[in-house]
Amino acid sequence: MQKNTKTYYAELRRKLKEKGFDTSRTQTYDGMLRVWDGIRMLGDIGPQGEFYCNSNDLADPHRKEQIETIMQCIEEVNRS
């Protein structure tokens, strides 16, 4: 990744907020960016754009759609 982590996470936060997600930096896992839907934690984004989530969420159509939206945001920021 060419961008530094702080700039990368700032861009991700902005993009995710546009899509209705909340974010926070985690105190563990090396300060990853945690993504929430306002109520439930959906996963963590690492500094290289990797997304960690519960694989069981992929079986729920609503959660799967949310995860796909998060992945699209990551991809858009990585391309910019």
What is each model feature region?
Residues 1-3, 75-80:
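Short intrinsically disordered terminal tails
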Residues 1-29, 61-64:
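Negatively charged, low-complexity tracts enriched in Asp/Glu with abundant Ser/Thr
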Residues 13-17, 68-78:
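Residue-level detector of alpha-helical secondary structure
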Residues 14, 18, 35, 44-47, ...:
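Generic detector of low-complexity/intrinsically disordered segments
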Residues 25-40:
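Ser/Thr-rich, low-complexity intrinsically disordered terminal regions
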Residues 40-66:
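Intrinsically disordered, low-complexity regulatory segments enriched in Ser/Thr/Pro
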